[in-house]
């Protein structure tokens, strides 16, 4: 798809409708949160509000389908929409936050005007990682050492915007090359590697199909998957800081280092983005502790909590897939199986680590300190193996989508200057950025 067709088909009205509706439903939830008590007759309005929020959320899902012609853009928009809607419901009926609670947490002051209070609650709903609040997600990656050069103790707006802009340009070039390369692959080769049913081939898979598993299980996560989610986050941070809506300190890196992904647990808790963590852990904690009343701490509560988090993530991703891909809708059980397998993988690795500690008498380590290199190497092999076995269940469908649905950036440098030139520029600029501004790995 060329840029002219993308510009002609730019859904301005659809984006305005989606944005205004999202702001309206979040503002409605915020007003209920700060004005309706948690108990008493009036609380019925609070506890019935999720029905309205979820109904509008369904309409937002339909509206967000037309926000972009790119699967990656639609998927991220739908994912964030789902999280915003679920967060509204969390605040209303699960954590049951009210004006007093939020004042105690320094979200606003009791003396603030109601309009400002509503604004702060809407910002909290959009702040799905809880940055700068008591609910901030654990294991967030700190700011790069680049910002500590000289006498600096943190990012200044100018350096933050400059660094983010350079990385965004480099990421756009990377995604452009990936898309162009994938489109140049003959259709028969794509079908051979990622065709219907190949995700379930193991013993009878040939070397080329195992290469496809390596691409889907490892490369797809750490390069295009990571970058396609990270790029919009950086763009939003540039706009927000440039317009003065927020400070650079409110935009820590979205992803951690891939070097920390030597366990499945570490992959999701330390390396991968934490967009879903606050929302889904709130729901899982409510089910395990308030509804099922499981003792805490206990093994059952710990792993059932993890299971409900990944189940919630699976449900969100299945809903996204249904709206992104459109009819005819195929079964989404492979997606459910993939996210469920992660729970099994975490239980396996926790069990093996516990047995090793019992045999050797070694104490459990907190964090990354003191982990031997050979432990990490074994861990990388383990995580790679598990993702190669299970990721195709979830990711192979993307490779079967039509080309017009899989573009990643609106302007193609490759189409203008050629793939060879773009590739040389990518590697050359990547080395420069690594040493000049400390681009993350």
From Swiss-Prot:
It comes from the Eukaryota. Its EC number is 2.3.1.-. The keyword Cell inner membrane does not apply. It is found in: Membrane. One of its GO terms (cellular component) is membrane. One of its GO terms (molecular function) is O-acyltransferase activity. InterPro entries: Wax_synthase (IPR044851), Wax_synthase_dom (IPR032805). It is a multi-pass membrane protein. The chain crosses the membrane at residues 14-34, 75-95, 158-178, 306-326, 336-356, 377-397, 421-441. Pathway: Sesquiterpene biosynthesis; trichothecene biosynthesis. Belongs to the wax synthase family. Acetyltransferase; part of the core gene cluster that mediates the biosynthesis of trichothecenes, a very large family of chemically related bicyclic sesquiterpene compounds acting as mycotoxins, including T2-toxin. The biosynthesis of trichothecenes begins with the cyclization of farnesyl diphosphate to trichodiene and is catalyzed by the trichodiene synthase TRI5. Trichodiene undergoes a series of oxygenations catalyzed by the cytochrome P450 monooxygenase TRI4. Trichothecenes are sesquiterpenoid toxins that act by inhibiting protein biosynthesis. This is Acetyltransferase TRI7. The lineage of its organism: Eukaryota, Fungi, Dikarya, Ascomycota, Pezizomycotina.
